[in-house]
C-alpha cells in the first residue's frame, strides 16, 4: 500500500475513535460545568486531576511508543518473537513496580505537591484541603493509566490502533456516570467525580488485556533490572518523556500561575484547552500515533527518501486541517463556548473567560499539531535527546512569557504564552530535522501554507458574516446548535470548494482515498 494512503487510513482510524472519545469528553465537561461551574470546587478538581492525567498524555501520546516500538521491532526482526515478548514482560514488571511506588508517593506527599502546582491556594483553606483530598483519592489512577498506556504501546506495535484510541472514551463515560449517579449521594459531591476517574482508569487497562494476550504477551513473574534491551528503552524513554511533555508541562505552569489570578482562572484555561484538544487529538495526536511505526520501518530499511516524503506529507496534511480550524475557533470562540456549556453554574462570565482562553490557545493549534508529527521523526532515528533539549528551551520561553503577559492579559496571557512557545518549539524542531535528513520539500510546504491561509481567510469571512447575522447567545439551545452547525457547515463547504478550485493536492488525495474505500466496501 502507498505510504501516504497507509498513513492517512491509520490516522483516520485513530482520529475517528478519538472523535468519539472527545465528543464524550464534551458531554463530560458539560455535565461537570452544570454541576460545579467555575467554583473553587471545580478549580480543586482540575488541579488534582491534572497531576496524574499529565502522565496519561505524556506516556499515552508517544513516550512509551517512541522508545518501545523501535526496540521491540528490532528484537522481533533479529532474535524472534519469543525474545521480544520476554523483554516486554520484563518491562511490564518494572513499570508496574515504579507505578505502584509513584502512586503511593503521590497520595502520601499530596499536600506538598499541591503547594508546588497551586501555590495560590492558601494552605489552611477549604480549597487547598479539598485539592489534597482529591489528589489522594485519584492516586490509583496514576497506576492504572500507566499500565493502560503500556498496553497501547504493544497494540500500536502490531498496527492495532482502534482499541487504544477508543479506550479514553471509557474514562469519559465513567466520569459522567460518577457525576450524575454517585455525586448526588455524597456529602462532598465532587468525590463522585473522583470515583469515576479511578473506575475509568482501571477499565482502560483491563479492557486491553485480552488484546495484548492475543498478540502474544505472557506475564512472567520476574524482574531483570539490568536487562540490556530494557535499559536501552529506558534511556530512550526518559528524554522522550520530556520531549513530548513540553505542552503538558507548559499547561502545568499555566495552572500554577493561574492559581495566583482571580477565582475561576484555572477553570477558564481548562475549558478553553479542552476545545483546542478536539482538533489536536483528532488530527495531531492521531497522525503522530500513525506515523511513528511507518517512519521506524522506513529507517530500519534505510529508505530515507520515503521517510522524507512521509514527513513532508504529514506536515502538509496537518496544515490543511489546522489552518482553517484555527480561523474557525478564533471567530466562533464565543458561540462555541456559549452553545456547548453555558447553563447551570456555567454562566455568561464563565463563557467570556473561557472564550478568551480559547482565543489564545487557538493561535498555537498548528504548532501543537506540528509537534506531534515532527517529534516522532526524531524518535524513528533513535534520537530522543534533541526534542528534549528543544523542549527545555521552549519551556523556559513559556515561563518568561507567562510572567510578562499574565499581568496585562490575565489568564489569556498564560494561554498566549503557551501558544508562542509551541510555535518556537516546532520551528526549531523542523530546522534541526532538516539539518539531519536534508531537504523536506520546504518550498512546497510554504507554498501550500500560503494558499491555505488565503482559502481559510475567505472561509473566515463567510463564517463571521453568518455568525454576525444569525447567532443570538440568548436564544434556545436547539436553535443555537442549529445555527452553530450551519455556520461550521458553511465554513467546511466554502473551504472545500475553494480548495478544489485552487487544486489543493491534500484535498484531491483525501477525496480519491475516500472514493477508493467506498468502492472497496461496495464490492
Regions from the language model: what does each represent?
Residues 1-523:
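Membrane-embedded alpha-helical bundles of multi-pass transporters/translocases
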Amino acid at each position: 500500500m502507498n505510504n501516504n494512503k497507509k498513513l492517512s487510513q491509520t490516522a483516520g482510524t485513530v482520529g475517528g475513535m478519538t472523535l468519539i472519545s472527545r465528543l464524550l469528553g464534551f458531554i463530560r465537561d458539560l455535565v461537570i460545568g452544570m454541576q460545579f461551574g467555575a467554583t473553587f470546587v471545580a478549580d480543586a478538581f482540575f488541579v488534582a486531576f491534572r497531576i496524574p492525567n499529565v502522565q496519561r498524555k505524556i506516556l499515552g501520546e508517544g513516550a512509551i511508543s517512541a522508545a518501545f516500538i523501535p526496540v521491540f521491532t528490532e528484537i522481533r526482526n533479529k532474535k524472534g518473537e519469543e525474545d521480544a515478548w520476554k523483554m516486554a514482560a520484563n518491562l511490564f514488571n518494572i513499570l508496574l513496580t515504579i507505578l505502584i511506588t509513584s502512586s503511593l508517593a503521590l497520595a502520601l506527599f499530596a499536600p506538598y505537591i499541591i503547594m508546588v502546582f497551586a501555590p495560590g491556594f492558601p494552605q489552611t483553606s477549604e480549597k487547598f484541603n479539598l485539592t489534597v483530598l482529591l489528589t489522594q483519592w485519584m492516586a490509583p489512577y496514576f497506576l492504572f493509566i500507566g499500565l493502560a498506556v503500556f498496553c497501547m504501546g504493544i497494540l500500536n506495535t502490531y498496527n492495532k490502533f482502534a482499541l487504544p484510541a477508543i479506550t479514553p472514551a471509557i474514562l469519559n463515560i465513567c466520569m459522567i456516570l460518577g457525576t450524575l449517579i454517585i455525586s448526588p449521594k455524597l456529602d462532598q459531591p465532587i468525590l463522585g467525580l473522583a470515583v469515576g476517574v479511578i473506575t475509568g482508569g482501571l477499565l482502560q487497562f483491563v479492557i486491553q488485556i485480552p488484546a495484548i494476550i492475543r498478540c502474544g504477551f505472557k506475564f512472567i513473574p520476574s524482574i531483570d533490572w539490568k536487562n540490556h534491551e530494557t535499559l536501552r528503552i529506558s534511556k530512550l524513554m526518559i528524554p522522550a518523556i520530556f520531549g513530548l511533555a513540553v505542552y503538558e508541562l507548559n499547561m502545568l505552569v499555566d495552572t500554577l500561575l493561574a492559581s495566583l489570578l482571580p477565582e475561576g482562572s484555572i477553570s477558564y484555561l481548562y475549558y478553553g484547552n479542552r476545545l483546542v484538544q478536539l482538533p489536536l487529538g483528532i488530527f495531531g495526536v492521531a497522525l503522530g500515533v500513525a506515523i511513528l511505526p511507518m517512519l521506524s520501518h522506513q529507517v530500519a530499511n534505510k529508505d530515507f527518501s520515503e521517510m522524507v516524503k512521509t514527513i513532508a506529507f504529514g506536515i502538509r496534511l496537518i496544515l490543511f486541517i489546522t489552518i482553517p480550524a484555527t480561523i474557525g475557533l478564533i471567530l466562533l470562540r464565543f458561540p462555541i463556548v456559549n452553545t456547548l456549556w453555558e447553563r447551570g453554574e456555567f454562566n455568561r462570565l464563565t463563557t467570556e473567560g473561557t472564550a478568551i482562553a480559547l482565543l489564545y490557545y487557538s493561535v498555537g493549534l498548528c504548532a501543537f499539531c506540528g509537534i506531534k508529527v515532527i517529534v516522532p521523526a526524531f524518535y524513528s532515528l533513535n534520537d530522543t535527546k534533541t526534542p528534549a533539549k528543544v523542549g527545555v528551551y521552549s519551556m523556559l520561553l513559556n515561563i518568561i512569557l507567562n510572567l510578562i503577559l499574565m499581568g496585562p492579559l490575565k489568564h489569556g496571557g498564560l494561554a498566549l504564552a503557551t501558544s508562542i512557545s509551541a510555535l518556537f518549539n516546532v520551528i526549531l524542531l523542523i530546522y534541526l530535522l532538516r539539518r539531519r535528513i536534508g531537504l523536506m520539500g520546504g518550498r512546497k510546504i510554504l507554498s501550500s501554507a500560503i494558499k491555505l491561509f488565503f482559502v481559510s481567510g475567505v472561509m473566515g469571512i463567510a463564517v463571521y458574516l453568518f455568525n454576525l447575522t444569525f447567532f443570538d447567545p440568548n436564544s434556545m439551545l436547539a436553535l443555537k446548535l442549529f445555527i452553530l452547525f450551519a455556520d461550521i457547515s458553511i465554513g467546511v463547504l466554502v473551504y472545500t470548494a475553494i480548495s478544489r478550485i485552487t487544486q489543493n493536492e491534500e484535498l484531491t488525495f483525501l477525496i480519491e482515498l475516500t472514493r477508493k474505500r467506498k468502492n472497496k466496501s461496495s464490492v
